Amino acid sequence: MPYSRVGKILCALSSIFAVDAALGGAIAQAKYSFEIYGFAEADAIYDTNRVNPAWDDAFRPSKIATVEGTFGSNGQTSISVKQSRFGVQGSLPVENNVGPINFKFEIDMFGVGVDAGQTTIRLRHAYAEWGQVLAGQTHSLFMDIETYPNVIDYWGPTGMVFYRLPQLRWTPYRTDTSHFSVAIERPGNDIDAGQIREFDPALGANLRNDEKLPDFTAQFYTKGTWGHVQLGGILRRVGFDSVGTLNNEPKGHETGWGLNLGAHANVFQRDRIIGQVVYGEGIASYMNDGGTDLAPQATFTPQGILLDVHAKAVPLLGVVAYYDRYWNDAWSTSIGYSLTQVDNTNLQDPSAYRKGEYASINLLYTPAKNIMMGGEVMWGQRTDRDHISGSDVRFQFSVKYSFGAQINL
């Protein structure tokens, strides 16, 4: 593990406790609450076909090959500890008794981005909240974490909105059962140059994302003994420009937007029926898997003559349907299906991602609160714009040991 990365983590943790110490003298009578928690998990995985080797430890339909042999011959085994997690959360008192600062810092070992395929520190949460204001990295308001089913695959259903990112959040309305929040979140556009790479390779190579404005998100949530309902919304500027050209032309932007409705219903005492539907344009970067935010679109005359090429915010639909069944205190099963459907533009490559499907069933054994083991079977399929598809069946067996300690001062 790189020394600089370890140093950053230790500095962040020490900063939290430094604040604690600094405040201690002024507000010695106040209560401090900390929880240290986490788990060690090992996942044994076998694929009957092949996925992108950088993603052997997470089941993502977008990483399934649609051309036989792309990632080698069929069959692959992996054993991973990347899901293992460590976190610290708690509350710090504030002078003049104006309410606590609640904080959370959490990491796992699942490398993504430039670290994809590696077992390395990955920041999940790093935020603090005082009153109505939250600052830091956590789940997007566009996301509904309560629709995440009881699965052991790290990545989970493809059709979910699932994104953690830096943000500034305001919650003007909050009760014991409901809240309404708005936020500005870090922009991150995913642009597909498509067939522009073929008829103008230089332009295709020089196109880049342009992120001049933050993303604007909002969320309304309510719950009861029956379950919960959440509606999330997003409005964003999805822009592009060119590197090394006069005035960075061509350049431009489109408006991205989306609505995400999620809910679960409590049935048979402990069971849950889970559902989520999301639709929008230019929202793929917020999805759990697959798609692109912006792609080129050509306009033709009825005679087939090209009039112009312009950018288009790509439409996308995501669906999740799962059932969490608790047979008794020790045994449980989660079964369900999810999809992501993209409405490709006419200038995306034939091999561009069009649809991802994901289905799974498991049987989990929890003999004690901090021990879990079980197996899961997953099926996934990727379909490209040219309707060529590839599929994979995965078997996973996992063992997880959890730990935690509460400290009150």
Where are the language model's segments positioned?
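Sequence/structural signature of outer-membrane beta-barrel proteins
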Residues: D47, P93-E95, F110-V114, S140-D144, ...
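Transmembrane beta-barrel architecture of outer membranes
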Residues: L123-H125, L165-Q167, L213-T217, E254-G262, ...
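Outer membrane beta-barrel
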Residues: I27-D56, S62-D192, D210-H228, H264-F268, ...
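C-terminal closing repeat unit and adjoining cap/tail of repeat-based domains
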Residues: A359-E376
